Amino acid sequence: MLKYFGTDGVRGVANQGLTPEMAFKLGRDGGYVLTKNKKDGEQAKVLVSRDTRISGQMLEYALISGLLSVGIEVLEVGVITTPGLSYLVRAQGADAGVQISASHNPVEDNGIKFFGSDGLKLSDEMEEEIEKLIDAKGDNLPRPSAEGLGTVTDFHEGSAKYLQFIENTIPEDLDGIKVVIDGANGASSALISRLFADCGVDFTTIYTHPNGLNINDHCGATHTENLQKEVVKQGAQLGLAFDGDADRCIAVDENGNEVDGDHIMYVIGSYLAEHGRLKKDTIVTTVMSNLGFTKALEKEGLKNVRTQVGDRYVSEEMRAHGYNLGGEQSGHVIMSDYHNTGDGMLTGLHLMLVMKKTGKSLSELLKDFKDYPQGLVNVPVKDKKSWKEHQPILDVIAEVEKDMNGNGRVLVRPSGTQDLLRVMAEGPTQEETDAYVDRIVKVVEKEMGK
């Protein structure tokens, strides 16, 4: 198990867990690992960007210093979305990219996320190689001087290139649909108006005035309450909410109901399939997707492949088997015909495109999708990793699954950050689902509860 890297890079409380010293080490060691195979005489090129957090520049300057110290040329993009950076790495032929962001997390947190030359997140093996250098007793990496040092070049024009790329994926103006857009006071805030205006959208924005401290503050993809109210108040047909780095999109229908990533993928996937454009008639999701998603797809003659939690694993599955649509319930949606990572603004525009092409409201497009009631209990345990070694727990899960008779599912998994075992079930009614969860929780508490 990795020490510093989680499912989405290195994260922590800025200036405490994630310090400038750590950012320098990540720049130096990460930069070396990502560019060490360059031929002699070729200077490596790395793009660096950030979201709108007050700690972003502090960490950015430290990280860039680390990159420069191993002779890397840095293109400083400024504030841009994470998918924007991913696109620019590929478009500019860079060796790597680094985004400084903690996505949907609160302002006190920040993170450092690396991308390879393909614009994709790093493999576990590469992250492990970086961690070994961070923890090494000495520093034996190159220390060039004079002309061997790296330089920094301003590349703020990258934003315009990225917006043009997204606009080019939309074949016609998206007029006729009134939309309210929540920018989470994050990285998309300065981009939304430029992009959606160029796509002919009738829109208003909320939470697009970042001040360094208000990112994700009761707004964005994880707090849609105010967007839901605003959609109804304005009589809009749609609401779109992005998170701090805009790799997620959560929607709101014309009635003010939240529409998560499962529902967005169902709408886009069904439309693509109807037009023969959904590869292998399959959508890739994680184990967290609601059983109702799979059932709705089955009615359409479509399939659902599931991976472990994390959009990187969805992306890996899509590339390995040639699928072109996947994502997470949380709003990461990957449309690989256009982009190789989740992109909130791209997703929102393509959801609008389906609405315009079909002439249907979002609630109409979702009328055949019925979520299964879900029950979830977090059980404090002594050793979360050992739960599969307890036969009584495995037995009760098997018994519950047998009783469900294909009309429900169980998911038991350890928390990634706390000493908890998450026990989740879905079933035909809330009462039955809660009873299933309770049966399993009682055995877990008896076997390994604190």
Swiss-Prot record:
Pfam family, one: PGM_PMM_III
Cellular compartments per GO CC: cytosol
Listed GO MF terms: magnesium ion binding; phosphoglucosamine mutase activity; phosphomannomutase activity
Essential cofactor(s): Mg(2+)
Reactions catalysed: alpha-D-glucosamine 1-phosphate = D-glucosamine 6-phosphate
Designated name of the protein: Phosphoglucosamine mutase
Family: Belongs to the phosphohexose mutase family.
Manner of cofactor binding, per the entry note: Binds 1 Mg(2+) ion per subunit.
Key words, A-Z: Isomerase, Magnesium, Metal-binding, Phosphoprotein
Record's comment on post-translational modification: Activated by phosphorylation.
Binding site for Mg(2+): S103, D243, D245, D247
A GO biological process held by the record: UDP-N-acetylglucosamine biosynthetic process
Chain positions found as Phosphoserine: S103
Matching InterPro entries: A-D-PHexomutase_a/b/a-I (IPR005844), A-D-PHexomutase_a/b/a-I/II/III (IPR016055), A-D-PHexomutase_a/b/a-II (IPR005845), A-D-PHexomutase_a/b/a-III (IPR005846), A-D-PHexomutase_C (IPR005843), A-D-PHexomutase_C_sf (IPR036900), A-D-PHexomutase_CS (IPR016066), Alpha-D-phosphohexomutase_SF (IPR005841)
Active site: S103 (phosphoserine intermediate)
E.C. number(s) listed in UniProt: 5.4.2.10
Function description: Catalyzes the conversion of glucosamine-6-phosphate to glucosamine-1-phosphate.
